[in-house]
């Protein structure tokens, strides 16, 4: 009888271990904040009045939290200041019931944080944005992963996965560095184990990465957790930095904690589908209604992406610890935070503060597609008097993007053409430091800039000049350098095509000079020359700026330090511009000659 009882208990331990989820999946000693909250999810009920015991004196059990879903447990722990790396053993279960066993790893923090990795991204960097699924396929064996909900890789279908991965990007580090790139930003790499979703009239795969199903798994079609760590390490060895794309606002409806939520308020639920207003003004409008704020912050982005309630303390801690774990585990240098303006304000500051505490050099950029410079500045450190103040380093600077596109394409007007650039930059007074903003000409949600330029290479060059000489951190969208084009017609997939040459058997290989047309290669070379100059230019990477009021389509500004002055001139008209040297004398006085940095 005793033997039978022992075997029954042993079987229980094995079954529970197989069905048990524990997050964070491991943790680190040496954190400034020694608190840790474990989320435990079992396939069977854990029960009430749960006891939780640690095998190590290095870990103190502070509190055991049960929630409405009996399959969950949230355990507050505190690590000793002297805690060492080790394997912990926890036992837990309801009093008088069979106890469950959990082994857990404490690891040492990386000694290279802030020097070799987690270095931050700054104005001297040049960011390259790509969708990893669409850049290059370096390992065709991971295109199909048995057990995933959707298992196709069909390049003929622009809405399906195509097979790009980390290895494909690694294989082209030389290409990127020859272009002058210092930093790689990929759209999200976290697992999107989803069925094809019906979106905007099409069945779409999660190829873009924004539909998370398990935060602690990197998508195996990209290379998985081990492949991502290898990718980040290889990038750092080459002197490249990595930005990861975070999404705190929502997850896929097929995320495991949406299918079995811990609490009733884990998701921002509505009686029927309610999308956000997309009007960020309600967050700083002194006259805004509480209803409009709620719709903006709690509305679902689309109907298959449940909106996360970051006011739930357990969910907030889960997301914060995941951000810390990811940074330490993979050594990323910065975060670009998607859908920033739709997230709970206090939560965003809390997660940013936690990251800055553990990784003082890290960079955080909020992505908020906004309607004004004031809206832009609201989501970063600013000089405005508002009831709430954000703490992110900078923002993805849509207003400067729109201004550069207007300067590239539109005739000079009081507030249009190059005057839009002038007036937009004149409003930098609202930012604490606009040098931390990420500036760009297009991205994965916009028409490609070469198409917007009317496929005019001279217009494109003019816009590239601004991109690489204005204040801020410049970002290039993959393929711009080889004149990839398209409008978002009928949808975003049209501006997310495969990079030519990234797949075996491609008819052309634009990673190679021989595969590029003379025009394409001239643009690649143009960007490379300007980017390489910029990288070594104190004026462009840390200098002040002085701009002059545009006249007759002629816009002039200077970037300067005590040791260097760079003059940038743009004529957007169809006639020669007037060289008004007397007006520019306060920046040109004392100089007798200059050189063209491109020729």
Regions found by a protein language model. Name each.
Residues 1-24:
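Bacterial Sec-dependent N-terminal signal peptides
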Residues 19-47, 108-111:
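Beta-strand/beta-sandwich contexts
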Residues 28, 106-129, 134, 138:
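Low-complexity, Pro/Ser/Thr- and charge-rich linker/hinge segments at domain boundaries
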Residues 32-87, 92-95:
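Immunoglobulin-like IPT/TIG beta-sandwich domains and homologous Ig-like subdomains
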Residues 77, 564-571:
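Short, well-ordered beta-strand segments enriched in hydrophobic/aromatic residues
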Residues 98-107:
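Edge beta-strands of extracellular beta-sandwich domains
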Residues 135-329, 348-358, 368, 374-376, ...:
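Substrate-binding/active-site clefts of carbohydrate-active enzymes
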Residues 250, 322-324, 328, 333, ...:
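Active-site-proximal helices and loops of the catalytic beta/alpha 8
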